């Protein structure tokens, strides 16, 4: 892995997929790597925009599984973005650990692995509707802003913690508002291409405070959400 996005996400999990005009990552298979090599020195060659994009998945992992990691990022963000070894090694190791722990319990995404989709219901839809003008991490950042707003609206997360997540994304330099050029009604329709949709119903992974997600019933981590509420959240961003 020579980028932070690859180190945080693509290199761990075993999914090898391709994008389609309909949506991203729709066609693929599972093939687990035997080892993952992360070259932190290569991160120094990245444009700032690409480094920030990788931070989107990094913060997502902290949000779903590690309050300690979230607080480390808050306190050491400048060191991460200036490629200090101790800080970069910390996020590289913890990204891999969090994703590995989830994937090894649910490789085929029959339940628990859905938590890795935190923020992606809106995020992937924005990525596609933007015609990929937004990088994956930029779209995910907006998706995470939508997710914490929804989590707070449903009473699973305090408004203070929701704002804390959004502020951290903004400190990285990532967007948390939907660009004006995106048609919001088209975005609402695109939500239905999300892989978590069941029986025509939108389903969202919901955050339960920083470092945890809601398990709605045994091995069920996504909640059906009415389109009207999803539209309301999107119109606010």
Question: Residue ranges of each PLM-predicted region?
Answer:
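Gly/Ser/Thr-rich beta-alpha loop segments that engage phosphate groups in nucleotides
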Residues: 15-16, 30, 121, 125, ...
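A generic hydrophobic-helix recognition signal that picks specific residues
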Residues: 25, 32, 112-113, 202
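Structural motif
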Residues: 45-51, 85-87, 133-136, 197
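C-terminal charged capping/lid subdomain of soluble metabolic enzymes
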Residues: 56-58, 156-237
């Amino acid at each position: 892995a020579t980028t932070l996005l690859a180190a945080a996400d693509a290199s761990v999990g075993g999914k090898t997929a391709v994008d389609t005009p309909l949506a991203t990552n729709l066609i693929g298979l599972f093939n687990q790597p035997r080892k993952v090599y992360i070259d932190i020195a290569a991160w120094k060659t990245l444009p700032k925009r690409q480094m920030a994009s990788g931070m989107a998945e990094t913060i997502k992992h902290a949000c779903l599984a590690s309050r300690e990691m979230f607080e480390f990022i808050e306190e050491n963000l400048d060191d991460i973005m200036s490629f200090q070894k101790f800080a970069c090694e910390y996020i590289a190791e913890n990204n891999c650990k969090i994703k590995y722990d989830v994937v090894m319990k649910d490789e085929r995404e029959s339940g628990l692995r859905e938590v890795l989709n935190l923020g992606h219901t809106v995020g992937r839809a924005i990525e596609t509707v933007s015609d990929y003008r937004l990088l994956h991490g930029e779209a995910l950042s907006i998706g995470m802003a939508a997710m914490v707003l929804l989590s707070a609206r449903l009473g699973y997360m305090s408004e203070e913690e929701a704002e804390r997540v959004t502020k951290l994304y903004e400190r990285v330099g990532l967007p948390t508002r939907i660009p004006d050029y995106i048609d919001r009604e088209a975005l609402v329709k695109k939500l239905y291409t999300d892989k978590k949709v069941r029986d025509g119903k939108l389903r969202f992974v919901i955050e339960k405070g920083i470092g945890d997600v809601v398990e709605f019933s045994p091995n069920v981590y996504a909640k059906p959400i009415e389109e009207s509420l999803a539209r309301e959240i999107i119109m606010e961003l």
